[in-house]
């Protein structure tokens, strides 16, 4: 299989061996350095493959250094492709380019076959192509068939646009040249045969004339012998007359027959030679006619080649013209687009001119009203300042009103509690006055009732009564704390309202600053923003303090409420026990005397309530009230500051540059965060 595949390579190698080259070119290793191929190309087309180009091919690459061989082969293949494209106008787009690296490293036969195909194409298409074609025709028929197949593959790899006409012309030209060579050889052979037959004919004609002369001589001798009576032989002996039946007659007859046979044979050979000469003349005439036809076909092929060259040039010019036509079409489309854009721009410019005229008229109109607008702006600013002052006064008055309302509510609650206590005391006094006992009996009754009770219960009762008084007084303080808490909550709400108004004002100022010129932004609103930031910090500090104080007060209130409920439950339990004991004492006293018992009970209760009322009530100190109010104000200020800081961070953080954000003051940390740290 490998031999069948490489059959074309060996055929091309046999043809390459016929070239007269200085470098060795007998095998694949000698061809792998590229020197022999370069010499062959220089021999084929010295005007393209010049001596200076041949000098660049290094002959020292025959050794082990395959990189030098690869560089030589690269130069050879590149020059071959340039020759095909520039000189022969071949486009070898479908032909696989030989891999020079595989040739240099491994002496690959397939790649060498492709390289030798390109070299064969150069030899067939060069100026001395007739001599190389005749050398190819002198090879064996198998080699000629393989070489013809290699040329057909090379021709089939040409460009598709040139494929149909050029391949047929090239094949017909090659086949015509090969047939012409065969006919020339046949004509030479026939001419040689004709020359030999003519020589034979001349020899036979000479021999015929000699035989005729000999025959005439023999006939003359025979006639002489017939007329003479005696015949003398060579030895001088008389042979006697020639008579039929004699020995001499028989011998002469035999010689005559032999001569006749030879004459007939010579005449037959002459006729055969004449026929052969005529046949060869007819063949020679047919060959001459065929040669004339082939010469005409070669002339037609050359004319067709010239026409193909003209068509190729016209095709190239047509391609160039088509490219120019495409560019002109694109330019025309761009020109049309530019025309449309120019029309649109003209329309826009006309609209802009009209708008500018209208704007100029409007500017003339508004120039008169500009002074009035500035006056109105100043008046509006004054009115805004007055409105701000009035709103702040209104807020203060609302805050004072709310404080007074809180105090009024606290006083109303205290009044209601006092009225309830008064009603309860009246009921108890009425019950006590029903006894009508004297003070002495009352004293004895009380002493008796106290004597009847154990001392532990008496002490416990006294302690519970004191705690009850303290809790009642603490309840009054608790109401005061609740009032303070309400006041603090109201103040916090007022501060939140002020914070809301301040935030709205900040938003309006920021909106105005965004809509106005950025140069006026820093000059007009910088001071106002700084003032608002300072006010915001103060308010937030106050709000934080008030929040912390309100939370602490709320915790205290809840603790006091829980303690109060627990104490009330204990008081209720002890009161029930006390009433049971008191009823038992009353029953005991009634068992002694019912009148004394009622008097003792009423007098004892009156004294007990007098003692309870005379005890001093604990009051809240002034310092505690001041601390509560200051804590409440701090709480409100801190809350306001936190709210303003958050809104300012939202407003100033978006839509500003890095430098503008760096100029702003960072918001202060809350008091609670500082305390936690």
Swiss-Prot record:
Keywords: Coiled coil, Cytoplasm, Cytoskeleton, Developmental protein, Endocytosis, Endosome, Microtubule, Synapse. Residues 6-123 form the Calponin-homology (CH) domain. The coiled coil domain mediates homodimerization. Transmembrane segments: none annotated. Residues 135-436, 478-588 form a coiled coil. Pfam families: HOOK (PF05622), HOOK_N (PF19047). GO terms for cellular component: centrosome; endosome; microtubule; synapse. InterPro entries: CH_dom (IPR001715), CH_dom_sf (IPR036872), Hook_C (IPR008636), HOOK_N (IPR043936). One of its GO terms (biological process) is endocytosis. Homodimer. Interacts with microtubules via its N-terminus. It comes from Drosophila persimilis (Fruit fly). Belongs to the hook family. It is found in: Cytoplasm, Cytoskeleton; Endosome; Synapse. This is Protein hook. One of its GO terms (molecular function) is microtubule binding. Involved in endocytic trafficking by stabilizing organelles of the endocytic pathway. Probably acts as a cytoskeletal linker protein required to tether endosome vesicles to the cytoskeleton. Involved in modulation of endocytosis at stages required for down-regulation of membrane proteins that control synapse size. Not involved in synaptic vesicle recycling. Required in R7 cells for boss endocytosis into multivesicular bodies (MVBs). Has a role in regulating adult longevity.
